[in-house]
Every structure is written in structure tokens, then in C-alpha cells.
From Swiss-Prot:
It is found in: Nucleus. This is Nuclear hormone receptor family member nhr-40. It holds the Pfam family zf-C4. GO terms for biological process: cell differentiation; regulation of transcription by RNA polymerase II. InterPro entries: HNF4-like_DBD, NHR-like_dom_sf, Nucl_hrmn_rcpt_lig-bd, Nuclear_hormone_rcpt_NR2, Znf_hrmn_rcpt, Znf_NHR/GATA. The gene is nhr-40. One of its GO terms (cellular component) is nucleus.
């Protein structure tokens, strides 16, 4: 008889393990509620951090939920947030024990360190408010935040909700989100670095098909490393277009894997994709560029030897590059300068790690200003973006301490630079479109539309 692998076994199917208290669960065991990977035994059953936190909060806060459908919604890894009523019902059905909740476990004592931090935050708020008087943003609504033109109200709202930094379960939520995003990013990088895959032809058709990043056969065929030495060469407009189409194809596949897509209509999904299309290829290029001076090799020079100036360039995996030059200012050169100085250098000065990058990219994607969003879609995206803003600041506070506020503010301001750079690249492709109409993803998502 064939025995299924451990990763396919649900924990409630392992009675011998279930009865042993504090025993580590087998690697690959699935959450009994949503079938994500379980992080341990929580409230008497094997569950992931997300379901554990959801169950505890629902009971501690005495929340009541109502199903908007027939009361039997599917509770899976990618759709577990759709219906909280059915999710809580399944938690009980699978044996989660409310008596196992320790209600006083996470109470935070008022320590001197906490008092000092709150005083520092209060001082910062007062300082930001003083600076903001008379600015255009001071009359803007605090309930709506636009990451492309961030106001100080963004910072104030996040600081007021910074209790998440002290909540261990909230931190676990953020870490779980980042782990999922890093796994997804790893697949995107593998395809991008091998650049063997065939680019998508139609954005609409792509949104109807299954996600290729989850296709094991497809990934195996298209992620072989390229052999041989890669010689650098200057990127032409045609080569840049080729890489934009590749990155837009990856963006569509990446977007289809995001949990929020399960809650949106097709038109809302396409609206988000179109709004993010000019940004995604630029931020991928800026973050994943590696130049010779970034390696760990130190070259010792003679005392009288002057090192060669380091070219300020951004590289694609095939060796093509764009760089700052001494040519007269034009749209093409201005775009290079803005992307290199405003994004590439900024991320390196701030020492942005990939864990922060994937969360920041998610934040940029959730744009409630996207043209074509339905009223329900707009509201959904607004709520999700506020949640992501809080998670990003919470994560930075944990990882970077006092630097968090500076990094957070700079990332929000960098989104404006990305938007401006995107407008320049649109002009380049707009001009190119007049003489060369190809109806590729650039035409569909950036120039003409679907």
C-alpha cells in the first residue's frame, strides 16, 4: 500500500502524535483549518500562525461574525480571510480548544523603556504636525493615504497604531506574510535570472489561466542557469522593451498568487495590474542590480594608483545595462538618473533587505487610486493597504529599531520617485509605439489599454 508523504497528511489523521503533549510535529504537517504548513500545536491541534492568531483574537475580543453566503464557505490557504464566520466555525469543528487560551499571557507591563518610547513618539507627532501646518496635505483627509504622495498624517496614523510592535502574535502575522512573499519572490527571481520563459501575449487571457509559478513542471523547464560568461552591453530601447515585457509577464503571474486576488472581480484585478505595470519592472531592476563594487572582493591598490570611477549603472540578468552618462539631458537620460539616484542608491543607503522589499512591493501594488476599480474593490484595497502600512512599520520597528521611522518615511517618498520615473518611461514607449505597434503587454498595460 502506498503511504502519502507527510506534507499531504492532516494532523487530525495522526492520533498517536496528537495525544502527546508538547511533542514536535513532523515537518510538512498541514494546518487542520486552512491546509497551510503548521507551525506547531496550538490550542490542541496542529495549526499555522495565522489560524492560531485568528482563533485567539476572535475569542479574546468576543467577536461575532456572520457568513454572507450559505454558511459552508471553503477555508483554504489562499481564501482563509474571505469568510471569518466559516473560518471560526472550522476552527471549532477541527478541535481548537477555547479553554487553552491564556487570556493574561500577552498583557504588557508599563516599563520605563515603554514609557520612554511613547514619550519619544509623542514628541515626534508634535514635531510632524508643526511642520505640516500650511502644507497642502494638512487639509487632506486622514482616512485616505496615497503612497505616491505621502502626507505626515500617514506617519501619525501608523504611530498611533504602533501597539502591534509589542504584540507577539501580530509580529508572527507579519513574519508569516513575509515568509509567503519571500517564497513567491524566489520563484519570480529564478525565472527572471534564467530569462528562458516565453512572455505572455494577452494580459486578460493570463488572468484567466492558472498561476505558472505553482506549476512544478513549468518552473523546472524555465529556471536552468545560463552557462558561459555574460558580457555587459548597453541597453537599447528595443532591449529595454524586451525586458519590460518579461517583467510584466512575471508581474501578472506574481499578482495572481496574492491572497487578495481571491476577493476581487476580474476588472478590479486588471485595474490593479495596469496601475502597477509601469512600476514593477523599474523596482525589480533597481533592487536586483548587482555591480562589481557590491561584491565582497577587496582590491588593494598601490599608494599612487587612482581607482577607476565606478560606472553608475543598472544591470539586467543578460548583461544589458542602463547607466548615467554625460549626454545632454533628455527623457531617456533623465529616467536613468532618476531611477539610479532616487531608487537604486536610496535602497542601498537604507540597507533594504529582501524581506522589507517584498512587503514594500505589496504596498505599492495595493493602489486604491487605480483607474477602473469598483467601489467595493476600492474599499477592499484601501483597507488592505492600511494593514500593509502598519505591518511594514511594525516589521521595521522590530528589525531596525530607532531607524524604522527614517526608513519608513524614505520608502513612502521613494514611491513618488518611482511614479515620476514611470511617467518618463511611458513617454519613451509612447513615442516608440507611434512607429512600432506590437500590441504586446506594454501596449496593453501601459500605453493603449486592454
Amino acid at each position: 500500500m502506498l503511504v502519502p508523504p507527510v506534507s499531504m497528511i492532516m494532523y487530525h489523521e495522526l492520533p498517536s502524535i496528537k495525544n502527546k503533549k508538547r511533542e514536535k510535529i513532523p515537518e510538512g504537517t498541514l494546518c487542520v483549518v486552512c491546509s497551510d504548513f503548521a507551525s506547531g500545536i496550538h490550542y490542541s491541534v496542529a495549526s499555522c500562525n495565522g489560524c492560531k492568531t485568528f482563533f485567539r483574537r476572535a475569542l479574546v475580543n468576543k467577536q461575532t461574525f456572520t457568513c454572507q453566503f450559505s454558511g459552508d464557505c471553503v477555508v483554504g490557504k489562499s481564501v482563509r480571510c474571505v469568510c471569518r464566520s466559516c473560518r471560526l466555525k472550522k476552527c471549532f469543528d477541527m478541535g481548537m480548544d477555547p479553554k487553552a487560551i491564556q487570556h493574561d499571557r500577552d498583557k504588557i507591563r508599563y516599563t520605563k523603556a515603554l514609557k520612554k518610547k511613547r514619550e519619544e513618539e509623542k514628541r515626534l507627532k508634535e514635531m510632524v504636525i508643526k511642520e505640516d501646518i500650511g502644507s497642502p496635505q494638512s487639509i487632506a483627509s486622514d482616512t485616505y493615504i496615497n503612497t505616491s504622495t505621502p502626507s505626515s498624517s500617514t506617519m501619525i496614523n501608523i504611530l498611533e497604531n504602533d501597539h502591534h510592535s509589542y504584540d507577539p502574535e501580530a509580529q508572527n502575522d507579519v513574519k508569516a506574510v513575509i515568509e509567503d512573499l519571500l517564497r513567491l519572490e524566489s520563484r519570480v527571481k529564478s525565472l527572471r535570472n534564467s530569462y528562458r520563459f516565453e512572455s505572455q501575449v494577452s494580459a486578460t487571457s493570463c488572468m484567466y489561466s492558472s498561476c505558472l509559478l505553482d506549476d512544478i513542471t513549468y518552473m523546472a523547464e524555465n529556471t536552468h542557469e545560463n552557462e558561459g560568461t555574460i558580457e555587459p552591453f548597453e541597453c537599447s530601447v528595443e532591449k529595454l522593451r524586451e525586458w519590460f515585457v518579461r517583467d510584466l509577464s512575471l508581474m501578472l503571474e506574481w499578482g495572481k498568487c496574492l491572497p487578495i486576488m481571491e476577493r476581487l472581480l476580474l476588472n478590479d484585478k486588471l485595474a490593479l495590474m495596469k496601475a502597477f505595470a509601469p512600476i514593477f519592472p523599474l523596482i525589480q531592476l533597481a533592487f536586483y542590480t548587482r555591480n562589481e563594487f557590491e561584491c565582497d572582493i577587496v582590491i588593494k591598490l598601490e599608494p599612487d594608483c587612482t581607482p577607476k570611477p565606478i560606472p553608475e549603472r543598472l544591470n539586467y540578468p543578460d548583461g544589458s545595462f542602463i547607466e548615467k552618462g554625460n549626454k545632454p539631458a533628455n527623457t531617456w537620460e533623465e529616467m536613468h538618473t532618476m531611477l539610479i539616484d532616487g531608487c537604486y542608491k536610496m535602497m542601498r543607503q537604507l540597507k533594504i533587505k529582501e524581506s522589507t522589499f517584498v512587503l514594500y512591493k505589496m504596498l505599492l501594488f495595493h493602489n486604491p487610486d487605480a483607474d477602473g476599480l469598483s467601489s467595493l474593490g476600492k474599499k477592499t484595497i484601501e483597507n488592505e493597504r492600511m494593514r500593509l502600512l502598519t505591518q511594514l512599520f511594525s516589521y521595521l520597528s522590530t528589525e531596525r529599531g530607532k531607524e524604522a521611522q527614517t526608513i519608513f518615511s524614505n520608502l513612502l517618498m521613494m514611491s513618488a520617485t518611482l511614479s515620476k520615473t514611470a511617467s518618463f518611461i511611458k513617454r519613451v514607449f509612447d513615442f516608440n509605439h507611434i512607429f512600432n505597434r506590437t500590441n504586446d503587454l506594454i501596449d496593453q498595460l501601459i500605453i493603449v489599454g486592454l
